[in-house]
Regions:
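Conserved phosphate-binding catalytic cores of ATP/NTP-utilizing and phosphoryl-transfer enzymes
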Residues: 1, 100-123
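Short beta-strand scaffold segments in enzyme catalytic cores
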Residues: 16-21, 113, 124, 130-135
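Short beta-strand-loop/turn "lid" adjacent to the catalytic site in phosphate-handling enzymes
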Residues: 58-95, 101-104, 115-116
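Short glycine-aspartate micro-motif
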Residues: 6-10, 68-72, 121-125, 132
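Short glycine-rich, Thr/Ser-proximal phosphate-binding strand/loop in the N-terminal lobe
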Residues: 5-52, 140-141, 145-147
């Protein structure tokens, strides 16, 4: 049976955390890197930090030239699909992971999915920035998350 390799990344303004799992052997590894919010550090640095985290996770799982089935990135600072697509393509180039195996979401959307899967609910992110996101009856609402210049009340930003 082919090993199914999954990598999840939480990309933020303070730090980047990545976790990987090989579902055949149930091995789980975790690594932390520096900030990778593309709105703060730029697309190039963001992509490089995330790619380094992905590489560390895959190396820890014992792969020299791994091909994960999916790399899912929840990234702060990614507020539209075109920006997410630019980050996805750049990350693919740097990591060597095929672009069709990389998905990039806004961090608060990824947080919602991790808690509620496809059900209704509300989540808040209160880190370097702040944002609240909810889904109900097929509709979504996002409040905040616009950065410190426009207002990040409730965040840890100084």
């Amino acid at each position: 049976m082919e090993k199914l390799v999954l990598v999840g990344v939480d990309s933020g303004a303070t730090k980047t955390e990545a976790v990987g799992m090989d579902t055949t052997s149930q091995v789980c590894v975790f690594t932390t890197e520096g900030p990778s919010n593309p709105s703060v550090v730029g697309i190039e640095k963001s992509s490089a930090v995330i790619a380094r985290a992905v590489e560390k996770v895959l190396t820890s799982l014992g792969y020299e030239k791994p091909t994960p089935h999916i790399v899912a990135v929840g990234a702060a600072g990614v507020v539209n699909k075109s920006y997410a697509d630019v980050l996805r393509k750049r990350l693919s180039v740097l990591s060597g992971v095929s672009a069709d195996r990389v998905v990039v979401f806004e961090d608060v959307v990824a947080a919602h999915a991790s808690v509620f899967l496809s059900s209704d609910g509300v989540v808040g992110i209160l880190g370097t920035g702040s944002c609240v996101y909810g889904e109900f009856a097929g509709h979504s609402v996002r409040v905040g998350g616009w950065g410190h210049l426009l207002g990040d009340e409730g965040s840890g930003y100084r």
